[in-house]
Curated annotation (Swiss-Prot):
Keywords: Ribonucleoprotein, Ribosomal protein, RNA-binding, rRNA-binding. It comes from Enterobacter sp. (strain 638). InterPro entries: Ribosomal_uL4 (IPR002136), Ribosomal_uL4-like (IPR013005), Ribosomal_uL4_dom_sf (IPR023574). This is Large ribosomal subunit protein uL4. Residues 44-71 are annotated as: Disordered.
């Protein structure tokens, strides 16, 4: 199959298996959920009655005071006591096979092509690391919410995009399923397309 280059009177021949396969919603959902789960810190922690600060002495004798019996000031029902079922640091990551991950990326890229959300250009750069230059370039292309993927990370482009809302710049090795879905449009250079094809082959 061929992808039309927007900034040149030509087309780029690409693999049907990468840019023209059926959309596997279940696979994409599984991979996106796993990717998001892997981004969770999982560092929450609370103290049990064994970990809170306090004496181990029985507050008062068992019988004869008229008060409810009590064995520790660290009891969960006491103020400043431990938590009954204390949260523990947790690893939320989910295992995803390489074949599944690549399959999900191919599904997403193919769907972007079908929805006309993927724009392929020969080159994409700015002369200087100026936000104004990139903003004007995107305005000329009628783009606002956009992910720009280049073959190699362009320093000028990266710096120019840092202060633009809903604009992100990545190199071909930095793509992920969540980012591809999150933006309205995805701009890829011809070099990036070739690199992605090789990565997902």
């Amino acid at each position: 199959m061929e992808l039309v280059l927007k900034d040149a009177q030509s087309a780029l021949t690409v693999s049907e298996t990468t840019f023209g396969r059926d959309f596997n919603e279940a696979l994409v959902h599984q991979v996106v959920v796993a990717y998001a789960a892997g981004a969770r810190q999982g560092t929450r922690a609370q103290k049990t009655r064994a970990e809170v600060t306090g004496s181990g002495k029985k507050p008062w004798r068992q019988k004869g005071t008229g008060r409810a019996r009590s064995g520790s000031i660290k009891s969960p029902i006491w103020r400043s006591g431990g938590v009954t079922f204390a949260a523990r640091p947790q690893d939320h990551s989910q295992k995803v096979n390489k074949k599944m991950y690549r399959g999900a990326l191919k599904s997403i890229l193919s769907e972007l092509v079908r929805q006309d959300r993927l724009i392929v250009v020969e080159t994409f750069s700015v002369e200087a690391p100026k936000t104004k230059l990139l903003a004007q370039k995107l305005k000329d292309m009628a783009l606002e919410d956009v992910l720009i993927i280049t073959g190699e990370l362009d320093e000028n482009l990266f710096l120019a995009a840092r202060n633009l809302h809903k604009v992100d710049v990545r190199d071909a090795t930095g793509i992920d399923p969540v980012s591809l879905i999150a933006f309205d449009k995805v701009v890829m250079t011809a070099d990036a397309v070739k690199q992605v094809e090789e990565m997902l082959a």
